[in-house]
């Protein structure tokens, strides 16, 4: 079974291959943590990485509270770094079968 560090490393490599620029990893605030902050063209992308194997889909561990915390942390990052313009939250699922990228997940 892969640990979270391995999963994040694989996710970073995957995103770089897609042309993303990794800006920061494991960004923390009082609101929560964002695994990867990246740039996709003009857009800032906040990426939550989930890994796992077995019968439970890693994405099932993401609930509304987690999404709200991601949104707050993303907004804080934008303000703290004086960034304007488009931004989004993505999820990357890393399993032994491969990597799936879900773009533009905003639930609020």
Swiss-Prot record:
Family according to the record: Belongs to the UPF0102 family.
Protein name per its UniProtKB record: UPF0102 protein TM_0253
Top-level taxon of origin: Bacteria
One of the record's GO molecular function terms: nucleic acid binding
The organism of origin for this protein: Thermotoga maritima (strain ATCC 43589 / DSM 3109 / JCM 10099 / NBRC 100826 / MSB8)
Database matches in SUPFAM superfamilies: Restriction endonuclease-like
UniProt lineage: Bacteria, Thermotogati, Thermotogota, Thermotogae, Thermotogales
Entries under InterPro entries matching the protein: Restrct_endonuc-II-like, tRNA_endonuc-like_dom_sf, UPF0102_YraN-like
PANTHER family: UPF0102 PROTEIN YRAN (PTHR34039:SF1)
Pfam families, sorted: UPF0102
């Amino acid at each position: 079974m892969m640990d979270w560090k391995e999963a994040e490393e694989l996710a970073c490599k995957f995103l770089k291959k897609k042309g993303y620029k990794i800006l920061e990893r494991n960004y923390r605030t009082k609101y929560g943590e964002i695994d990867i902050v990246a740039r996709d063209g003009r857009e800032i992308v906040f990426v939550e990485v989930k890994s796992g194997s077995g019968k439970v889909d890693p994405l099932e561990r993401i609930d509304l509270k987690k999404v709200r915390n991601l949104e707050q942390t993303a907004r804080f990052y934008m303000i703290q770094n004086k960034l304007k313009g488009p931004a989004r939250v993505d999820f990357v699922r890393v399993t032994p079968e491969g990597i799936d990228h879900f773009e533009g997940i905003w639930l609020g």
